[in-house]
Design a protein with these regions (language model features):
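Active-site-adjacent structural elements in folded domains
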Residues: 112-115, 124-127, 193-200, 207-219, ...
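Active/binding-pocket-proximal capping segment
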Residues: 183, 189-194, 245-289
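Hydrophobic/aromatic-rich core segments of domains that either
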Residues: 281-303, 311
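Arginine-glycine-rich low-complexity intrinsically disordered regions
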Residues: 366-382
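Glycine/tryptophan-enriched, flexible segments
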Residues: 14-201, 310, 314-367, 383-384
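Glycine-rich, charge-decorated loop segments at or immediately adjacent to ligand/cofactor-binding or catalytic sites
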Residues: 3-15
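Conserved structured core elements
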Residues: 93, 122, 133-140, 156-160, ...
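Contiguous, well-ordered alpha-helical segments that form the cores/surfaces of helical PPI scaffolds
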Residues: 126-130, 170, 214-215, 224-234, ...
Length: 384
């Protein structure tokens, strides 16, 4: 964590931890300080374990890992898509190199606030989440570098916003500590049913629709922004925060499927999988925390964050010739335009998956960008 548990202004069992991020952030920022990173031990300071050589008798390769099939083995990294996402390499050295590049060499951190909603490429966000999730770098180390950058070069909203994201990460750690296994339950941490918590009029339980789930996993829902993000996840193990919010909203709030199926799929696929962030974000995305429900208008999100369709076309080659004005909703193309674009909906690209009747939300969900939806798990909390 960024803040040590003993330093946050809540009880030792965190029972008084707010269930909303903003009250949590306000308290910790006003009353707590991150501890300094622990310096690395000097050479020879720690004794070598007995039989050390035995630990290196077998050095596994990717081929030795227990992937289920050749398809999974073939997408074990992002190297095949260098223009789509950062090719991640594990370990502390790679993690520190990324911190150094993002903060000092490129100074991308100075514009992070403006670029953070990007989806295509390696530098629209810090991309530190996989290394943070695997313990390759500490959030305290990251913040120490950011503050050094602020003192030596520039301090602005962007530099603060990376720290802000790491506070989100802490929030989910302590949120999970407070609620325990409730973050894995269908009814979530609010303790009510779907009908009583997130929706007006008792909308009933989650739907059982294997075809909708399979389409979502495969990136074949007929909703380009959803499909592009799901294909990126399958190919690289990564997805932007913006993408995670949208795909989670579609699964739980449009298709009405059990949100836990999405959380489980992310757990299976994400390079930056973190239990508390993933499940905490998904339960929030589904409206099962008792807080605000953020239902995203997928078409509007596409127009707002991928107006020319560069991201969608990168991951969905079937749509590469579709005019930008139709990229959010290819089904709106007139027949002659579809023929010219070599993309007849229902033939070359799936028709939009038929969704259940629209449901109303009791907490003012909106079709834009409020919560962190799926990436908190899957969106926020990864230190991206």
């Amino acid at each position: 964590t960024l803040y040590h548990k003993d330093d946050i202004p809540f009880s030792s069992d965190v029972s008084d931890l707010p269930d909303g991020f903003t009250p949590f952030r306000n308290k910790v920022e006003n009353k707590s300080e991150p501890r300094e990173p622990v310096p690395p031990p000097s050479k020879g300071a720690l004794p070598m374990p007995a039989n050390m050589s035995d630990a290196f008798a077998f050095e596994p390769t990717v081929a030795d890992l227990p992937f289920a099939n050749e398809e999974e083995r073939s997408v074990a990294g992002a190297g095949a898509h260098p223009d789509g996402v950062l090719p991640f390499e594990g370990g502390e050295s790679a993690a520190l190199a990324r911190v150094r590049y993002y903060v000092w060499e490129s100074e991308k951190i100075a514009t992070y606030f403006e670029t953070r909603n990007g989806m295509l490429g390696g530098d629209y966000s810090s991309k530190l989440a996989p290394w943070l999730a695997h313990g390759c770098v500490s959030p305290r180390t990251v913040v120490a570098e950011v503050r050094k950058f602020e003192s030596q070069r520039v301090e602005n909203k962007s530099t603060y916003w990376l720290i802000f994201e790491l506070i989100w990460r802490d929030f989910f750690k302590f949120f999970a500590l407070k609620h325990g296994d409730a973050i894995f339950r269908s009814e979530g941490t609010a303790g009510g049913s779907m009908g009583g918590s997130g929706y007006k009029g008792g909308a009933g339980p989650w739907r059982d629709d294997p075809a909708a789930l399979a389409a979502w996993k495969a990136g074949k829902t007929g909703y380009p922004l959803v499909d592009a993000n799901m294909r990126e996840l399958a190919a690289t193990g990564f997805m932007s925060n913006r993408g995670r919010q949208n795909v989670a909203s579609w699964l739980a709030l449009d298709a009405g499927l059990d949100w836990r199926l999405g959380a489980e799929w992310f757990e299976n696929k994400l390079l930056d999988y973190d239990c508390s962030a993933n499940w905490g974000n998904w339960v929030a995305a589904a409206g099962m925390t008792g807080g605000r429900v953020n239902k995203f208008n997928i078409a509007k999100q596409t127009k707002d964050y991928d107006p020319e369709g560069a991201y969608v076309k990168y991951w969905i080659p079937e749509l590469k010739d579709v005019p930008a004005k139709f990229i959010a909703e290819p089904r709106q193309m007139p027949g002659d335009v579809a023929q010219k674009a070599h993309c007849v909906v229902g033939v070359d690209y799936p028709a939009p998956f038929k969704l259940p009747p629209r449901r109303e939300f009791s907490s003012g969900g909106r079709g834009g960008g409020g919560g962190r939806g799926g990436g908190r798990g899957g969106g926020r909390g990864g230190g991206r």
